[in-house]
């Protein structure tokens, strides 16, 4: 955990697959799907198509995977990830019950399809404010994106900037090099969309440095400036950064002799032994060697 205490709350998720019977039920009723009856004409999300879309577009596939996920810690409801559908209720219950593990399933809330309009995100500034309508901010599907995290990220940026504008403070603008939120917004406002936009690591040219293990280093100072990081958390962050900087300096200065003990550790890590002195920092650059691996020989740690 980066700045808080560890959380070990876990629950089981399950995997299952559709089969030939599932496919047949859907094909027999495909004419009842608004997606294929001409009632919905918009371009759907590319990365989470409905089950009938999967069956029709990938007819050569013998089965499709789905995830069965608990909706919460205090409910027996399960969410079927990968099984969205626009088919009628009786068809849904019929094809769900063809799937292994769901033979006796009951539906709490049916799957459904929606079609909605969105604005052209090219009209937006980096603050998510409309250029032609000062004071109006957009976020989420309204901006042409798809997904919960994408909507939440934009909602945060739009809301923060609306508040900052009222307070007459500098806006919050996240760039591509510092966050995936910055990449998401930059793509929307400079490239526009032809189908619902989903954020993926492959969209960022900085993905090697936009990692979860340095998220606090990249974003905590911004949060502090906004007033979202209290003194206790900021002190903890500064302490961690100071320790990290000191350890990196020590790694550059610490030199190990080519002893048998060192080479035994290196060989056990399946990397080549050394014949001359070597810096700790150089050993840590080897992909096979972790910081913990060198504990037995790094007596100054």
Task: Mark where each language-model region is.
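Short, small-residue-biased leader/transition segments that mark boundaries at the very start
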Residues: 1-9
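C-terminal catalytic lobe of FAD-dependent flavoproteins
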Residues: 30, 34-42, 48-93, 97-98, ...
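Mobile "lid/hinge" segments at catalytic clefts and subdomain interfaces of large enzymes
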Residues: 185, 193, 197-225, 230-234
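A glycine-rich phosphate-binding loop feature that marks nucleotide/adenosyl-phosphate handling sites
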Residues: 42-49, 110-119, 172-188, 202-204, ...
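A glycine-rich dinucleotide-binding beta-alpha-beta segment and adjacent secondary-structure elements
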Residues: 67, 79-145, 173-186
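Internal hydrophobic alpha-helix adjacent to the cofactor/substrate pocket in enzyme cavities
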Residues: 151-174
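Glycine-rich phosphate/pyrophosphate-binding beta-alpha loops
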Residues: 141-149, 205-207
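Extended, charge-enriched "interface" segments that sit outside catalytic cores
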Residues: 203, 220-225, 229-301
């Amino acid at each position: 955990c980066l700045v808080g205490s560890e959380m070990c709350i876990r629950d089981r998720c399950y995997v299952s697959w559709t089969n030939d019977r599932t496919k047949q039920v859907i094909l027999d009723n495909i004419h009842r799907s608004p997606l294929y009856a001409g009632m919905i004409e918009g371009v759907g999300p590319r990365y989470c198509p409905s089950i009938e879309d999967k069956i029709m577009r990938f007819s050569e596939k013998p089965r499709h995977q789905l995830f069965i996920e608990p909706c919460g810690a205090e409910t027996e409801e399960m969410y079927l990830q990968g099984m969205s559908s626009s088919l009628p209720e009786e068809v849904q219950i019929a094809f769900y019950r063809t799937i292994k593990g769901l033979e006796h399933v009951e539906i709490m809330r049916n799957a459904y399809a929606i079609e909605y309009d969105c604005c052209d995100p090219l009209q937006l500034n980096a603050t998510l404010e409309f250029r032609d309508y000062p004071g109006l901010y957009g976020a989420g599907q309204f901006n042409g994106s798809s997904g919960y995290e994408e909507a939440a990220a934009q909602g945060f940026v739009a809301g923060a900037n609306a508040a900052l504008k009222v307070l007459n403070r500098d806006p919050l603008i996240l760039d591509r090099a510092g966050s995936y939120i910055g990449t998401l917004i930059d793509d929307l406002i400079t490239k526009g969309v032809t189908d619902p936009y989903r954020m993926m690591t492959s969209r960022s040219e900085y993905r090697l440095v936009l990692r979860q293990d340095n998220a606090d280093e990249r974003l905590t100072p911004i949060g502090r400036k906004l007033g979202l990081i209290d003194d206790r958390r900021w002190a903890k962050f500064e302490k961690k950064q100071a320790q990290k900087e000191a350890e990196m300096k020590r790694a550059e200065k610490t030199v190990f002799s080519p002893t048998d003990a060192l080479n035994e550790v290196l060989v056990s890590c399946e990397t080549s032994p050394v014949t001359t002195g070597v810096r700790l920092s150089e050993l840590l650059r080897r992909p096979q060697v972790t910081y913990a691996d060198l504990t037995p020989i790094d007596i100054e740690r």
